[in-house]
Amino acid sequence: SSMEPEMEQKVKDQHMERCVNLLVDELGVYSTAQEAWERIYHVSALEALHIRNGHIKNPSAQTKERYQEFLRFENDFSNCLAVSALKTKFGPHLLSAQKILNQLKSTLISPFIEKVSRLIDENKERRANLNAEIEEWELEMQDEREDLQYCFEELTEMTQRLGRCVLNDQIKTLIPSAVLSFSHPFHPEFPAQIGQYQRSLCAHLDNLLEDRVLQCLSIPLQRKILDMEKELGLQITEKSCDWQLIYGLDCQSYMSDFQPDLRFRFSLGFTALWHRLEGNLPLHSSPFRTQKLRNGHKKCLPLPPLVHGNHWQMLESLVKSKGSLGTVLLGAMAIRSFNWPIVMILGGLVGSFYMYEYAAWTTAAQERSFKSQYSRLLQQRLRTDVQQTVSGFELQLRQHLAKVRNCWEAQSNETLNDLNVRTAELTKQIQSMEVLQLSLKKFRDKGQLLASRL
């Protein structure tokens, strides 16, 4: 009882002893009396309730002691409930969560981090290889661009050299033979028929010269260009295979003012002999002769004329006069210089030769004369346009080579752009993988922190 302190302490000791025996000896909850002593409480629940409700204004010392014991009981009881709950319910869940975290770390997060790291390294290596390939491709493009320029210059020089050679050769050899072998009805007595003959001859020469130039110049150039395109790796199209130089020859335009001279001319006539003599003998306007100086150069000195200029003018007027005065004077000089029989024999020979040439001056001979005059004039005029024609060939070649260059540049830039696109895609993949790797590492760190807290 609370009114008898001695009895209260005695009863308390008895209860303490009985409870210790119960907990240690009978129940075996604790192994020592000290542990059991700490779990024995002497409290009054009603008294503690009154104190908390404020019914006891001035509690005694024993009341305060019992209230403190009750507070210790509440604290130990709540801790016991918490420990019991952890052991019976929350403990297995915490262990299961910790096990799941460890499994996630070992089977998912760590391998995933390693996989992402390996992919990042592989993509970085691949990007480095692509960058090296881009640099190598740019250097290769520069080298190929220089080689292409050199090849273009070589083809241009070849076109100039071969074109000039082919044209001169065709003008020198093909035109005379082609004109001579041309066969078409020839009627010199009809001017309209001569014009038709000339137009047919021009068309024949146009086709023949164009075909020869195509075979000798265009086809070799086309083969070299195709070989160059194959070396550059360009796609050979039908347009590239069909390319050829355009050589539009129009002989009719060159010979539009051609007027053939089909009159009979005696080869031993005075005019013919005069032209031959005029071409062989140096006149007062003859070419200059050269004299070598001490310094190695040559000095031009005029050749002295065999006959004075005044004498040539007199002879020319006599020979070329339309009257018979020249013939009479020359005949008188011949009779005076030679005997009559010799003059008659020479006259007979000259007359016989004249009759032979006049009889041989047939339509075929006139056609040969026409072809000879036509061939000489056409050769002369074509030679003057050789350089202009070669320049036209060069311009066509440069235009085609410019198209080849543009095609090569487009293909090279397409390859370079493809490499740059692949590099950019790898860079994006690397960045996204790095972000993923960082997130995985954060999750791993949070999991480790949660596992340590559990």
Swiss-Prot record:
Effect of residue 78 to L: In strain: Isolate SIM7
UniProt-recorded Gene Ontology molecular function terms: GTP binding; GTPase activity
Entry membrane topology: Multi-pass membrane protein
Outcome of swapping residue 195 to S: In strain: Isolate SIM3, Isolate SIM6 and Isolate SIM7
Residues in the Cytoplasmic compartment per record: 1-322, 362-454
GO BP, one annotated term: Nebenkern assembly
Regions of this protein lying in the Mitochondrial intermembrane compartment: 336-338
Region (G5 motif): 30-33
Primary localization: mitochondrion
Effect of residue 150 to F: In strain: Isolate SIM3 and Isolate SIM6
PANTHER family linked: TRANSMEMBRANE GTPASE FZO1 (PTHR10465), TRANSMEMBRANE GTPASE MARF-RELATED (PTHR10465:SF3)
Function per UniProt: Essential transmembrane GTPase, which mediates mitochondrial fusion during spermatogenesis. In early spermatocytes, fusion of mitochondria give rise to two organelles named Nebenkern and constitutes an important step in mitochondria morphology, which is balanced between fusion and fission. Essential for fertility.
Record protein name field: Transmembrane GTPase fzo
Organism phylogeny: Eukaryota, Metazoa, Ecdysozoa, Arthropoda, Hexapoda
